Amino acid sequence: MKHEVVTLQRSQLAQAAEMLVWAFQSDQIYCELFPQSDARHKALVTMFGGVVGYALHYGEVLTTPEIRGGACWLPPGQAKVTLWRIARTGFGLVRGIVGFSQEARKRFMAGVMHTETAHKRLITVPHWYLWLLGVAPDRQGHGYGSALLQPILARADQDGVPCYLETQTERNVVFYRRRGFEVAETGLMPGVDLPVWHMVRTPHG
């Protein structure tokens, strides 16, 4: 089934953040950081709102008309998340992290530093960065993820630009490999001791 893909509007940011919480609330990394479901929801809705707001300002957020999935992309030249850019988008991402418990914040930031260091080391040329891809649980397995990736993958191929991402599950590794990504490095994410895969997609001619 072919799914329509549209650009998320800023007025839809809160709805998109709630959808992403629904998509990721059972992921092991967030269950490790926030064992209590109420605290997890509160932390994630603020954090994902910050991610979406940042990507709307500096990149592209693709979704479906009914907002059942979302892909947050940062383009070549903007793929590095910086504090200055976070400030320009209203500190939403910082507010989310500050709202974590001290222990969760320490563990989360250890993971962030690890992924940022690997990102800089593994891909040094201009590239698209898939910061976040989430699909509502009741739509997973029905082609939404592929549809949300396709517009930017096609543009990257046309422009001869690679793409980069990180993922924390083997199931996602299989999914991304089918879309042309290859594992560049694997490791354990500090703070949570969970696996992380760093993946790169070279442009397809």
Predicted regions and their residues:
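A short beta-loop-alpha structural element at the N-terminal edge
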Residues: E4-E18, W22
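Active-site rim helix/loop that mediates acceptor-substrate recognition in acyltransferases
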Residues: S37-E60
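Conserved beta-hairpin
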Residues: L56-L74, G134-A136
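Conserved acyl-donor/pantetheine-binding loop and adjacent beta-alpha core of acyl/acetyltransferases
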Residues: C72-G134, Q140, P190
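Conserved GNAT acetyl-CoA-binding A-motif
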Residues: P126-W128, R155-Q168
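Conserved beta-strand-loop-alpha-helix junction that forms the acyl-donor binding cleft
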Residues: W131-Q140, Y164-V173, L188-L194, V200-T202
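Conserved acetyl-CoA-binding loop-helix of GNAT-fold acetyltransferases
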Residues: L132-V135, G141-A154, R178
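Conserved active-site alpha-helix within GNAT-family acetyltransferase domains
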Residues: S146, Q158, T169-T186, V192
